[in-house]
């Protein structure tokens, strides 16, 4: 049996691509070979693909000298499969090329299975790697899982302001401005009152300028161009900026941290990055909590605009009624399409691991005949490849937050927001079996 991932199947949803890579890494790491029968080849962008072809020719020649006949044949098979995959490409794809080929052992330790993966990563891997051994090498793939959310920083004090972004480990200074604000006037009299008024006016104008530049730096096409915004400084300016109505209202919801720093400018930026690290890490969990909390709110208000459980969610999706699918990233539901060998009709089943072991789900209830399995897919993977066909979006949920844990344990780890109300009893009728049933008396926390 040959498994493959078509090269270049890169979608427009970064989080889905990251989820696919995470699943692929887990699969590859669980593969065990019989001897040195597994080849890992990663070619970075702009690398001459013919160079890798020549390398494989040399490796194939060297493999002929392996003394053990079984090992020799396994290595030759793996390298030959890799060569065949490489021939599919005239040049290295834009983001590089990843190929994994080999013969692996199944769980019984005896049965062998042929594995062939070739794909263009959804973003570049700038590292060449060739390895032939008893396991697949996945370290370069883990670089694809690095978070690339972009965060904005405003460092503001009485001397000036700095605007910057942080993306992964890369930071960029967008703009710097300086200001000379008059110091406080210590003497009394009318002049001190006038001076204080002028000073306050200059401070106000400076704050207005800082707010205006925040909008020009962090808003593009009428929406924020960063995931979160950090305000930092060593005086009251940062707090005033967050509270003033001069700051664009579209930026207020994405302020994730306000921190005190000892310096202005780039030194202040370095300090702000360190002090806001926890807040930036929590951004994803905050977004998840908001999404799932909204889901729970719709349930409590009985709006009829959400769906949960595998059967209801998949039926609503089939009807085109689901706008956003909420999906537990480790959902253990398998989608089967089975066919009656006599009547020719098909059914779709959604089974959890326990149900998959029960033969009753694969028999015709009337005749007792065994049904033919037409297809078998992990439901999460099937959704990731097909969600766009139903004009839906997919949002992954973890069980790391309290809300996420409740969604997974209480609602089966799958649900969705609807475009319009659906009478699920009428829509479902006689549907496939399986999945996790939901009991509102015992499951809702």
Swiss-Prot record:
InterPro entries: eFR1_2_sf, eRF1_1_Pelota, eRF1_1_sf, eRF1_2, eRF1_3, Peptide_chain-rel_eRF1/aRF1, Ribosomal_eL30-like_sf. GO terms for molecular function: translation release factor activity. One of its GO terms (cellular component) is cytoplasm. Its main location: cytoplasm. Keywords: Cytoplasm, Protein biosynthesis. Pfam families: eRF1_1, eRF1_2, eRF1_3. It is found in: Cytoplasm. Belongs to the eukaryotic release factor 1 family. Directs the termination of nascent peptide synthesis (translation) in response to the termination codon UGA. In Stylonchia UAA and UAG codes for glutamine. Heterodimer of two subunits, one of which binds GTP. This is Eukaryotic peptide chain release factor subunit 1. The gene is ERF1.
